[in-house]
Amino acid sequence: MSQANAATKASSDVFFNASLEDIDPEIFGAIRNELGRQRHEIELIASENIVSRAVLEAQGSILTNKYAEGYPGKRYYGGCQYVDVVEELAIERAKKLFGAEFVNVQPNSGSQMNQAVFLALLQPGDTFMGLDLNSGGHLTHGSPVNMSGKWFNVVSYGVRKDDHLLDMDEVARPARENKPKLILAGGTAYSRIWDWKRFREIADEVGAYLMVDMAHIAGLVAGGQHPSPVPHAHVCTTTTHKSLRGPRGGMILTNDADIAKKINSAVFPGLQGGPLMHVIAGKAVAFAEALKPEFKLYAKNVVDNARALAEELKSHGLDIVSGGTDNHLMLVDLRPKNATGKRAEAALGRANITCNKNGIPFDPEKPFVTSGVRLGTPAGTTRGFGVAEFKEIGSLIAEVLDGLKVANSDEGNAAVEQAVKEKVIALTGRFPMYGYQG
């Protein structure tokens, strides 16, 4: 073997066999530190969850090497016979999970799935209705800073000021006045049951499409803990992470063949090129997990835990927007503790409790300050936390907020936060992740 060939072989051996730690210790270190953070902190961000080792393995597989523009059986590249199997499994499992006739599993994110529906069903300048961001909607539901708010005429609906619940008569009124081409239901911070049937009645009355973004509650729908929008909506979108407990990505479902064709064309070639086949593999694995009987128990536990956490927080003098929760999340009004969301998020973070500041309906504070935090139970429930643990977590949150109230500063109360942090580490140590003890 020549010296050049030997060098090439040696380089190839390193390329295919060296570990991440050997090749890039900086990235390896960041990942290791993030794993430590996830192990030792309580994750209460409602849009986050913990995937299984099987999902991690699928998403980290050699499928990342394969380009597969198009759809199964109709690709623009050769060598797609095995990734076709992967995508077809993901589609069939999603159909079974949600009772939908047509599914597109290619959207790379929640924003892109919603953009695909807009591209398929609307023209620039068309009118659509969506839940106002301040009432628990999403940026892609018509926020003026988002493409959805820039390209279309948006009419927002919101919650009532007295009880923070949706008033369906106040959804119907602007729909009749504005005759939107599409009505979008669903949100990111609404803790009550959605009346899909009434939304469809309103949509039919004004001749609009009904689109449901069930990204936050898809796992609860799959697990039988929230009514399904699929029989009512013309088209549904959902992320595949959050309560569904899969990899980060999006999905679109419909029972209408004509809409399905438009959706497929909007996703590819309208918005995306080659799909992320390693992510689609992770989606397929997560759907298989969600089809198992134990996922129904998981979904029930998510809701039970959320209700327990909300009641515990109320017992410590905090207000819960709309008075409680019927799903996996809650908005906590911090004003009884004289705290802002910004301060509370930072103080809880120092105590190893992760959440996000969040505006509450009719919030007097600025968006980067807020009067509330949003809390969710999917990740903690995946870890194995039950009602007892979430009651303890509620008490720990109140302890931090009471300390923050006494300190009345951005720095918080170091002694209280350290004491809570030690309790959190003890709690998380009883529920190891990925086979790790301690």
Curated annotation (Swiss-Prot):
Gene3D superfamilies reported in the protein's UniProt record: Aspartate Aminotransferase, domain 1, Type I PLP-dependent aspartate aminotransferase-like (Major domain)
Q: Which GO terms describe its cellular component?
A: cytosol
Which biological processes are named by the entry's GO terms? Answer: glycine biosynthetic process from serine; tetrahydrofolate interconversion
Q: Spell out the subcellular localization from the entry.
A: Cytoplasm
Where is the PTM N6-(pyridoxal phosphate)lysine found along the chain?
Answer: 242
Annotated site (Plays an important role in substrate specificity): 241
CDD domains, from UniProt? SHMT
Q: Which reaction does it catalyse?
A: (6R)-5,10-methylene-5,6,7,8-tetrahydrofolate + glycine + H2O = (6S)-5,6,7,8-tetrahydrofolate + L-serine
Please list the residues that bind (6S)-5,6,7,8-tetrahydrofolate.
Answer: 133, 137-139
Could you tell me the superkingdom of the organism this chain comes from?
Bacteria
Query: Which Pfam families would you find in this protein's record?
Result: SHMT
Q: Does the keyword Cytoplasm apply?
A: yes
**Could you tell me the keywords of this UniProt record?**
Amino-acid biosynthesis, Cytoplasm, One-carbon metabolism, Pyridoxal phosphate, Transferase
Per the record, the major location class is cytoplasm
Pathway per the UniProt entry: One-carbon metabolism; tetrahydrofolate interconversion; Amino-acid biosynthesis; glycine biosynthesis; glycine from L-serine: step 1/1
Q: Which cofactors are named for this entry? A: pyridoxal 5'-phosphate
Q: What is its EC number?
A: 2.1.2.1
Named from the GO MF annotations, one term is:
pyridoxal phosphate binding
Family of the protein in this entry: Belongs to the SHMT family.
Functional note? Catalyzes the reversible interconversion of serine and glycine with tetrahydrofolate (THF) serving as the one-carbon carrier. This reaction serves as the major source of one-carbon groups required for the biosynthesis of purines, thymidylate, methionine, and other important biomolecules. Also exhibits THF-independent aldolase activity toward beta-hydroxyamino acids, producing glycine and aldehydes, via a retro-aldol mechanism.
| Oligomer status and interactors | Homodimer.
Record's HAMAP family?
A: SHMT (MF_00051)
Protein name per the record: Serine hydroxymethyltransferase
**Organism field:** Brucella ovis (strain ATCC 25840 / 63/290 / NCTC 10512)
